Structure formats: structure tokens, C-alpha cells
Amino acid sequence: GEDITEEPVDNRAKLGMFLAFQYPESIPGVTIVNMLKTALTNIEETEYTTLELRLKVAEAMEQLGLSADFADRYLNEGFSGGERKRNEILQLAVLNPKLAVLDETDSGLDVDGLKVVGEGVSKLKTDDKGYLVVTHYQRLLEYIKPDFVHVFVDGAIVESGGVELSEKLEKEGYESYL
């Protein structure tokens, strides 16, 4: 592998990395579709026409069950927590990274939002992509089936396993690791 920890964020994105934030910021005046056009153009170094991009975004929105006007809203402005997370998954779908880090994507979601986000990520999952899903709860893993589960304490892996480890954590908690 190649150490990219010192690379600027835009270079990491060009290499195929994506980070879904726990608390995505809002950017007034920038529409989702414009942000996606700029990001995709920079990552792929290809200029998309507005029509090409709108078709690509519309396809992803349909796949994720988002309304047609969603892409014309300002980036996370006035969004509920669930809408912010859905927007992150839309970005994930359109930008199509090789590796996605989903940092507590289930944080603040109600049952319906959790289902939309979980199923959205699950639909995007393929064998040639990697997903690092950070969560404290089993409920997200009912939709996103992990290949591996790791428990981190102070930045180090202290136990690894399969889905059964997440089920154990749901029942017993993290106390034995602290």
C-alpha cells in the first residue's frame, strides 16, 4: 500500500476516498447539484455538462428514494439530521469512491432515516469497493452487512470478529473493553 495520510484532502478524493461526516456542515448558496458537479469534475478531471450531471444525480436520487427537488436545495441548509445523512449517501452514490468512511452515519437518525441510509449504502456496496462504517449500534448493521467487525479502544483494535461480535456488543455493551 501507499501512505496517503499526508496528502491533501483533494488528492485523497482523486485517489477514490470519501468521508461521510457525523455532523455535515451546511453551505448556504451552494446547491447540492453544483457541489456534486464541482466535486465530480475535480475528482474525475472530466467536465460534465449540466444535463449529464443532472441525469446522473437524478438516477442516484431515484435509487435512494429522494425527491426530484432535493438536488436543487442548498447544501444541508435547513436540513434535518436525516436529510443531511441522506445527502451524504447521495454524494457517495454520485462520486462512486473506491473507499468510503462513514463516520457514525446512523447518529441522530430516526427509524425511517436509518432504514433509508442503511438500505442506500447497502445498494451501493460492491466487491470492488471498501466501506469503513463507524457505529456504536447494531441497528445500522441490520441493513449494512459487515464482513468484519472491529472494536477500537484508544485508537487500537482490541477485538475483531464477524457480525456475531456486533451482536455481542449490542447485548453486553463496551464495558469489558474499558
Which functions belong to the PLM regions below?
Residues L114-D127:
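Helical segment within the ABC ATPase nucleotide-binding domain
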Residues D128-H136:
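Conserved H-loop
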Residues G1-R12, N76:
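ABC ATPase NBD Q-loop/coupling interface
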